[in-house]
UniProtKB/Swiss-Prot annotation:
The keyword Magnesium applies. NCBIfam families: PRK00203.1. Pfam families: RNase_H. The gene is rnhA. Residues 1-145 form the RNase H type-1 domain. It comes from Clostridium botulinum (strain Hall / ATCC 3502 / NCTC 13319 / Type A). One of its GO terms (molecular function) is magnesium ion binding. It is found in: Cytoplasm. Monomer. It catalyses: Endonucleolytic cleavage to 5'-phosphomonoester. This is Ribonuclease H.
Length: 149
């Protein structure tokens, strides 16, 4: 199984308001190969962008891989590492407080992708000295800047 390292970051300008612009940045690494992806969207949230980055990155892999996935998103990392996703599925896509899970469609896509790959989710501190997390942040901001033009 190929070993792949993935860094993702999502961002949203005007999060929680109308007419937002959001984006994500992804760095995929396999051996000596490195691929960078950036994409921007209208009317989104930071959490949708964080989750979309992970879904997009895993979707790009053409065969099952062993993956270390680094993100500064507590939303994404906790949903996996603290078994929120498993509990949501068991509870018919309801949270512990019985409200509907937000971004259910994206979580369902991620759940399907996780059946294909072996993924270790690792939390990194955002806006610190992590080279690849910082690169993903820069890619997301570039995508938003270019989208605004």
């Amino acid at each position: 199984m190929k070993k792949v390292i993935i860094y993702t970051d999502g961002a949203c300008r005007g999060n929680g308001q109308e007419n937002t612009i959001g984006a994500y940045g992804i760095v995929l690494m396999y051996g000596e190969h490195k691929k960078e992806i950036k994409k921007a969207f209208r009317d989104t949230t930071n959490n949708i962008m964080e989750l979309s980055a992970v879904v997009e990155a895993l979707s790009l892999l053409k065969e099952p891989c062993s993956i270390e996935l680094y993100s500064d998103s507590a939303y994404v990392i906790n949903a996996i590492n603290q078994k929120w996703l498993d509990n949501w599925k068991k509870n018919n896509w309801k949270t512990a407080s019985k409200s509907p899970v937000k971004n259910k469609e994206l979580w369902e896509k991620l759940d399907e992708l996780l059946k294909k790959h072996s993924v270790k989710f690792i939390k990194v501190k955002g806006h610190s000295d992590n080279e690849y997390n910082n690169r993903c942040d820069k890619l997301a901001n570039e995508a938003m800047d270019e989208f605004n033009v």
